[in-house]
């Protein structure tokens, strides 16, 4: 559930974004100092969110150069400050929970929400590994995901983690 007044959730989401997403995805319409709005002090921003020698007033740029992203993934990883607003919270939440193992792809991962996404499942150690199951029936194919290998988090913990991350991004 999205609650932009829940500063604890927003702070957890900000820390998760910096730890897991900012290497490849920028949030270039956001400055680090805006994290004061959710209760971080400048010192906390520098200690918890800025790892690349940037200043508190700088834009949140990806550490990856666009050329590298295109070489590695075939496409430049999108800016998540744009994706969150264009796709919305429900889409992003579903997307981050819908990765599954797929040996036919370059990354070894696919996504039930966005087929053939170039992004590998960077959160698989937290969520675990899912596999796609397809059942045919009267209403056509029914696709679902089953957890094959558990991750470091329970399903409920991972759902909360993703919820905090999405809450922060939107």
Language model segments and positions:
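Electrostatic cytochrome c docking/interface patches
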Residues: 1-15, 26-37, 45-46
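Electron-transfer interface patches adjacent to heme c in soluble/periplasmic c-type cytochromes
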Residues: 40-112, 117-158
